[in-house]
């Protein structure tokens, strides 16, 4: 794994999960079910957890929703899922926590938006109630500031001061600074109200990639709180994936960011779990964490007019993801497995040798055979109509042989403890 220098932060414990610079970057997601439907919400949390989400946020926006949070927690516990639940509060959080104390106890973390808690003294009182409730229940809090719901009184105060200055800044720069000030001032208030520093996580979300990078660089330089990364709205499909990757990878490479969420707009028919998979793939391709064996495959060219290698690459990746629910327990360390599926002789043998297991399928005009390489050595040559089945059997046998109870992996002729990989 990559040993990037992380920005030093407090360590925030959220049930069995630690968020901070001494822990791996944590992936979280959010449900889109009606929280008042406890059964549907619990089932979606299960799906997100199965996909690899380590914390899940749920909307708590009404008495009906708040009254079901404890039931959702019970349903998850009954299914054997200890996934921490984050309550997303806006506008009326203090009232819901007061009327439904079991809701506050069942949640593992509260998300509070300073921009819509309320105005003036009344807003301060609401904020104070939520913070004190979190402290009494020993819960963590994410103070999450959003570009679209910034505290307008703070924004106006800072805009007025900027206009009165001898060298006024562009309004958008003042707005970015207001986001940061809102988060930091709210955290300071929370500490004064009795919430320990190691119970606070901050976020300042915007929708533009360059703005997010600028804001988080500045925020990270001015506090020691763990930071939650994500665009407010990344968008749909490839645009959302690219925008999230572009923003988060820059910050993560600089050691900024302790928990992430990929806010994709779901396409019709696409699974909610896609945002979890994208988050995992960002961290894994950067070498920051390993979640599932990865498949390296060539993009194809005129030498690979057959679609066989493309189909095999897809089949192998799907097979590995499906097996991980079992392998993760039986074969610790298997998530670091690297499999290559290549389409012709140009790069096929070389890439296959560099992978733990690789197969080089024949390109156009090449001999219809597919050599398989294991730990850099040519092991067998496959041919015929059952190449996919035979190759997956080799992968299965490799996993059983090299990972498991002894906690060791044979790699390039050496035996290496899994924890050192």
Curated annotation (Swiss-Prot):
One of its GO terms (biological process) is terpenoid biosynthetic process. It comes from the Bacteria. [4Fe-4S] cluster binds at residues 298, 301, 344, 351. Binds 1 [4Fe-4S] cluster. Its cofactor is [4Fe-4S] cluster. Keywords: 4Fe-4S, Iron, Iron-sulfur, Isoprene biosynthesis, Metal-binding, Oxidoreductase. Coiled coil: none annotated. One of its GO terms (molecular function) is 4-hydroxy-3-methylbut-2-enyl-diphosphate synthase activity (flavodoxin). Pathway: Isoprenoid biosynthesis; isopentenyl diphosphate biosynthesis via DXP pathway; isopentenyl diphosphate from 1-deoxy-D-xylulose 5-phosphate: step 5/6. Gene3D superfamilies: Dihydropteroate synthase-like (3.20.20.20), Sulfite Reductase Hemoprotein, domain 1 (3.30.413.10). It catalyses: (2E)-4-hydroxy-3-methylbut-2-enyl diphosphate + oxidized [flavodoxin] + H2O + 2 H(+) = 2-C-methyl-D-erythritol 2,4-cyclic diphosphate + reduced [flavodoxin]. It is an enzyme of class 1 (oxidoreductase). Its EC number is 1.17.7.3. It holds the Pfam family GcpE. HAMAP family: IspG. Converts 2C-methyl-D-erythritol 2,4-cyclodiphosphate (ME-2,4cPP) into 1-hydroxy-2-methyl-2-(E)-butenyl 4-diphosphate. Belongs to the IspG family. This is 4-hydroxy-3-methylbut-2-en-1-yl diphosphate synthase (flavodoxin). The gene is ispG.
